[in-house]
Amino acid sequence: MKVVLLVCLVWMMAMMELVSCECWSQADCSDGHCCAGSSFSENCRPYGGDGEQCEPRNKYEVYSTGCPCEENLMCSVINRCQSA
């Protein structure tokens, strides 16, 4: 019984964390983050660092798999951040 309660508690904490990071637009995210994901599970994610997955910046600020790169980096044709 204790194990079941512990699992439920951990699950609830994980769900609360996911909900607290949800976003509807870029304005919902703090500096250094973008709103990315599918239309049902968008959340604030950090901008890509050197070698990390990225999506090119776009005028609509809509990203599905990842954020654009951090400043001074560019998103390559293979969707990885690299030096500009």
Curated annotation (Swiss-Prot):
Q: Which family does it belong to?
A: Belongs to the AVIT (prokineticin) family.
- Gene Ontology cellular-component terms listed: extracellular region
Coiled-coil residue spans = none
| Major localization class | secreted
Q: What is this protein called?
A: U8-theraphotoxin-Hhn1g
Please give the InterPro entries that the UniProt record associates with this protein. Answer: Prokineticin_domain
* UniProt note on tissues of expression: Expressed by the venom gland.
Keywords, in A-Z order: Disulfide bond, Secreted, Signal, Toxin
